[in-house]
């Protein structure tokens, strides 16, 4: 997965690190206006948004080449949009978490952020 244009300075949910397990609905990052430019937030992006991509990598040498395989995530995002989880904001920390926890096989799922 590829996420771009995240929030400046604190793009990811607090305490989230590579390799953590997350559950559907967990907040993992925050939309922003960052991007490819020499100076942060001066790339012509005026609205905060998320650039989401999914790349298949079978061989690390294929990354950043003309042989990249990118998946059209339009159908995936449609399903996600129809099944959003409500979140709440902690005004003190400015972090968001999933409002409702859920059960999987009678085990309470809290994920990395909730």
Question: Each PLM stretch: what is its role?
Answer:
Residues 5-8, 35, 54-56:
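A mature extracytoplasmic/lumenal domain signature
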Residues 15-18, 26-29, 53-55, 77-80:
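Glycine-rich loops and low-complexity Gly/Arg-rich segments
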Residues 1-25:
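Short histidine-centered loop motifs in beta-beta connectors
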Residues 42-114:
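Acidic, glycine-rich catalytic/binding loops that coordinate metals and/or anionic ligands
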Residues 12-13, 37-39, 61-63:
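Extracytoplasmic/secreted cell-surface and envelope-processing proteins
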Residues 22-40:
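Short hydrophobic beta/alpha edge segments that flank linear recognition/processing sites
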Residues 1-5, 29-30, 51-53:
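Structural recognition of the beta-strand scaffold that forms the well-ordered cores
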Residues 9-11, 19, 40, 46, ...:
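Generic alpha-helical propensity signal that fires on short helical segments
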């Amino acid at each position: 997965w590829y996420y771009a244009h995240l929030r400046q300075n604190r793009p990811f949910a607090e305490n989230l690190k590579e390799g953590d397990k997350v559950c559907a609905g967990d907040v993992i990052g925050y939309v922003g206006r960052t991007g490819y430019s020499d100076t942060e937030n001066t790339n012509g992006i005026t609205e905060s948004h998320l650039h989401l991509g999914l790349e298949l990598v079978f061989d690390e040498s294929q990354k950043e080449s003309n042989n990249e395989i990118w998946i059209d995530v339009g159908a995936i995002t449609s399903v996600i949009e129809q099944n959003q989880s409500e979140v709440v904001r902690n005004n003190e920390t400015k972090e968001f978490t999933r409002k409702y926890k859920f059960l999987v096989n009678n085990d309470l799922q809290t994920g990395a952020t909730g």
